[in-house]
Amino acid sequence: MVVGNLAILVPSLLLQHFAGPAAPAVAASVRDVAHLAAVDTDVWRGAAPTSLEGYRSLAAAGVTTVVDLRAEPDRRFDDEMLQSFGLRMVSLPIRDGQTPTRAQTDAFLRAVDSSRGTVFLHCGAGVGRTGSMAAAYLVATGQMSGVRATLRNLSVGPPSLEQIAFTIRLQTDRAEQANMLVVAASRMLDAPRRILTTLL
């Protein structure tokens, strides 16, 4: 039992140590948003809010722009309703398990620059696509190297192999997609999870 716990605890502590300083704290009043964390003072990340109250509490905490990375449609909440909370909605669809293009990364940077308040970045679970975009943002703004941003992402949850290869290779002047062998292996290994998510 102790050995099993140490096998989980030691890598977690190492990730926290090497990932660098903790992200700034986020508002404790935000509800119904899993994996909520600050990327920096301007950007928060997390899972898609599961209720209207989640969006309302994000707005009350100072979020003015919501960037949705999901390629799969979410018909539970319409943009007009969310805009009534003072939220500007930006859609940059990325398929589950995949990574942002350079154009999507640039569009995200523009969304952050033009926001009047905090930007909330999310995908479905707030792990892979969100982590890839958050890493691209941190590297593009000179706050972290690709390796450090990858380590921070790993402390949130397990992204796909393709997403790890993308974030670890990030540099300030470019965001390269992983090579085709990594992409093929990643998508094959990640397919059962994506299929299960679609069915549930």
Annotate the PLM regions.
Residues 40-118, 139-153, 163:
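Cysteine-based protein phosphatase catalytic domain of the PTP/DSP
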Residues 1-22, 106-118, 133-200:
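PTP/DSP superfamily signal
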Residues 2-47, 87:
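Mobile, glycine- and charge-enriched loop segments
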Residues 123:
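Short cysteine clusters
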Residues 126:
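Conserved G/P- and acidic residue-centered "switch" motifs that form tight phosphate/ATP-binding loops
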Residues 130:
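Ser/Thr-glycine-rich phosphate-binding loops at phosphate-binding pockets of nucleotides
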